[in-house]
Amino acid sequence: MAKGQSLQDPFLNALRRERVPVSIYLVNGIKLQGQIESFDQFVILLKNTVSQMVYKHAISTVVPSRPVSHHSNNTGGGSNNYHHGSSPAPSSQPQQDSADAE
């Protein structure tokens, strides 16, 4: 599996498995809506009233209608390369470089 697919595949698979409605925005600005029926390295099959084959190179953004957990299959305590969405809380006071203080 290519490194670029290590986030893509679990995310898309969770959307497919849980039948989450998605909005897919294409690079030309068109918005498609439906459920991910299946996907491979190059395309996503999007099902609404009809099934559409959407080439991944034409996709700008995939927006789920609700949050999904795409890393739940990682039961080990070890770290992985997935970004879990948590980041350190910002400091309550702005920090200033000593060179900037006057």
Swiss-Prot record:
One of the GO BP terms on file: regulation of DNA-templated transcription
SUPFAM superfamilies, alphabetized: Sm-like ribonucleoproteins
Gene3D superfamilies (UniProt xref): 2.30.30.100
Keyword line: RNA-binding, Stress response
The keyword RNA-binding is assigned to this record: yes
InterPro entries (UniProt xref): Hfq, LSM_dom_sf, Sm
Bias-annotated ranges (Low complexity): 70-102
Disordered: annotated segments: 63-102
Keyword flag Disulfide bond: no
A Gene Ontology term for the protein's cellular component: cytosol
Domain Sm: 9-68
Membrane-spanning ranges: none
Record Pfam families: Hfq
GO molecular function: RNA binding
The organism's place on the tree of life at top rank: Bacteria
UniProt xrefs under HAMAP family: Hfq
Function: RNA chaperone that binds small regulatory RNA (sRNAs) and mRNAs to facilitate mRNA translational regulation in response to envelope stress, environmental stress and changes in metabolite concentrations. Also binds with high specificity to tRNAs.
Subunit structure: Homohexamer.
Family statement: Belongs to the Hfq family.
Protein's name in the database: RNA-binding protein Hfq
Native organism: Erwinia tasmaniensis (strain DSM 17950 / CFBP 7177 / CIP 109463 / NCPPB 4357 / Et1/99)
